[in-house]
Amino acid sequence: MRQALPLVTRQGDRIAIVSGLRTPFARQATAFHGIPAVDLGKMVVGELLARSEIPADAIEQLVFGQVVQMPEAPNIAREIVLGTGMNVHTDAYSVSRACATSFQAVANVAESLMAGTIRAGIAGGADSSSVLPIGVSKALARVLVDVNKARTTRQRLTLFSRLRLRDLLPVPPAVAEYSTGLRMGDTAEQMAKTYGITREQQDALAHRSHQRAAQAWAEGKLAEEVMTTYVPPYKNPFAEDNNIRGTSTLADYAKLRPAFDRKHGSVTAANSTPLTDGAAAVILMTESRAKELGLHPLGYLRSYAFTAIDVWQDMLLGPAWSTPLALERAGLTMADLTLFDMHEAFAAQTLANLQLLGSERFAREVLGRAQATGEVDDAKFNVLGGSIAYGHPFAATGARMITQTLHELRRRGGGFGLVTACAAGGLGAAMVLEAE
């Protein structure tokens, strides 16, 4: 094992995660229908600051992410600063790393803390699949640009006359990889076939995710980390995730047809994460700054790792690549972990990563490592359910996982937890967390 890389400031301070909060997550076109991501971000950051009782001017940086960009608010981070009463001089910028976006936001704030340029910051992300940047065709876009340069009405009419009826149809956001044309579900199908993952195994994991998430809500474990929201017309509160199917049975999952490979596939809407709206954020500080403010951190960021792999085959194996690197940098092994939380983009992707984490052959022949990362103990894995149940507002999922894992670690008396996710473009992320 290589030497561990401690995440500390120049003064030796650990990176403290003081608190975290999220909105409830809502299925597309339900509770947050018509609410843009920037407003979801304002909701969660405003409430996070109010609950923490930290002076607004103590936050020196806000790094926030959004995957489905809105052209009218390209820097969501700055809009959140301006819309929540934070100090107008607060540094703010936006990031995007697909499904690992808030992992990146956390890493960026941590790096600012380690560099000594700030002592406290906020990281998070928000996405809306209900408020989308519906575009126009390339032909219409080109004509509209040319029309702006036309000098006469005749010239403008000539330009418009070149358009066909189909050129006027709206264009929804792309769901396929730009470089390959493959949808993530196509890759999940490929991975299911490559690694022998059956439909029954996928449905069982999805059912497990919903059952555990429903139990977590029933036992009150999520109440502290999920805010109650009010949206226009402000009549009814929205306080719990609305995708969780706590009363479903395995027989219900078996009824659904494959969503991607219609004839021979096994990936369905039920064993995949749904399109979701929501936001999540965490406050990070140097350990000494937290003490100055009289705060007791949820936990600490021990290490992180980002990886990138080929997009044509096994594109969603990011966790199998990033997990051993994050563990190595933390100076830990799989056996040292109390909790292991993996983003469930698809049950097939999740099961493939779990399989390869325990594979000696994959470790030697693909990762170039002497031994497997290690089998993941089911008693430590996604103990409160995962993204298949909660949903997946792309940029918010990482912050949800971090907050949820730290709270659960504290309930168990402390220890180490690892959170990891795959992301579009063959990207992967993993972070090791510590709670006392």
Curated annotation (Swiss-Prot):
The entry's keywords: Acyltransferase, Cytoplasm, Fatty acid metabolism, Lipid degradation, Lipid metabolism, Transferase
GO cellular component, as recorded: cytosol
Reactions this protein catalyses: an acyl-CoA + acetyl-CoA = a 3-oxoacyl-CoA + CoA
GO terms (BP aspect): fatty acid beta-oxidation
Disulfide bonds: none
Domain of life (superkingdom): Bacteria
One Gene Ontology MF term: acetyl-CoA C-acyltransferase activity
Active site: 99 (acyl-thioester intermediate), 392 (proton acceptor), 422 (proton acceptor)
Subcellular location: Cytoplasm
Regions that span the bilayer: none
PANTHER family linked: ACETYL-COA ACETYLTRANSFERASE, CYTOSOLIC, ACETYL-COA C-ACYLTRANSFERASE
Family: Belongs to the thiolase-like superfamily. Thiolase family.
Protein purpose: Catalyzes the final step of fatty acid oxidation in which acetyl-CoA is released and the CoA ester of a fatty acid two carbons shorter is formed.
Protein name in the entry: 3-ketoacyl-CoA thiolase
Lineage, highest ranks first: Bacteria, Pseudomonadati, Pseudomonadota, Gammaproteobacteria, Enterobacterales
